[in-house]
């Protein structure tokens, strides 16, 4: 029997090269083993479970400015597991300890990430926040967060795309210093080199400058490092803040 229907109306036929049976006996896509294998093969291009279209921007209440003139502004961060923004409770604890020393201070945020800590410092009255971050993508998030708070990047906010060590060495040569330095590197990073440079007087105010290090709670830092003296250690869950003061 000859099928006289137009080609586009005929049933789709899946045929092995050595199969000479009429198409009525070969079976359709559902019972054809070759069509089944074809559906199970990895497909090219975008996959159904791909995260390509998943938004990489994270905006939650945890990323909210907690106090000051920009209180309540939602900050942006990335969904990447490699980035660990400073939690809201840690920021609240940090500025509770610093208290009035933030006002009119020059604040340096090393390994700034999305810039939440530096933005919070400006909100609480800091004269200047300098954000040091090696990732161009995260520097863009910092700029967006400054724009959200209507902070001019050439005024109260300064963004530097650079690694921490080269930045500190460069600023040491220029004899530039800050009143408060906040250092929050990835937890698997080497803290020693950066702290050692700062302890020799690099980037920190000679009389009364403060260095705050965020680190895992099980990590311990000595009482004295160079010109730095440990004043306080505050633990919040599995995270701790160590406060050093510089007397040069």
Predicted segment positions?
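Class I S-adenosyl-L-methionine-dependent methyltransferase catalytic core
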Residues: 2-248
């Amino acid at each position: 029997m000859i099928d006289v229907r137009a080609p586009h109306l005929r049933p789709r036929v899946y045929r092995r090269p050595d199969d000479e049976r009429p198409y009525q006996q070969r079976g359709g896509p559902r019972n054809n083993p070759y069509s089944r294998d074809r559906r199970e093969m990895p497909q090219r291009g975008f996959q159904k479970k791909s995260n390509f279209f998943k938004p990489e921007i994270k905006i939650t209440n945890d990323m909210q400015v907690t106090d000051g003139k920009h209180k309540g502004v939602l900050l942006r961060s990335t969904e990447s597991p490699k980035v660990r923004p400073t939690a809201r409770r840690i920021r609240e604890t940090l500025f509770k300890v610093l208290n009035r020393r933030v006002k009119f201070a020059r604040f340096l945020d090393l390994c700034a990430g999305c810039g939440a800590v530096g933005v919070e410092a400006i909100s609480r009255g800091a004269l200047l926040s300098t954000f040091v971050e090696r990732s161009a993508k995260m520097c863009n998030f910092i700029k967006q967060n400054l724009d959200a708070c209507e902070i001019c990047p050439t005024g109260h906010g300064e963004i530097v795309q650079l690694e921490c060590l080269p930045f500190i060495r460069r600023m040491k040569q220029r004899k530039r210093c800050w009143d408060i330095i906040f250092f929050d590197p990835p937890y698997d990073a080497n803290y020693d080199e950066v702290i050692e440079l700062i302890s020799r007087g690099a980037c920190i105010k000679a009389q009364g400058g403060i260095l705050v290090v965020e680190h895992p709670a099980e990590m311990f830092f000595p009482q004295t490092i160079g010109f730095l003296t440990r004043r306080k250690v505050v633990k919040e869950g599995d995270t701790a803040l160590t406060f050093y003061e510089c007397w040069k």
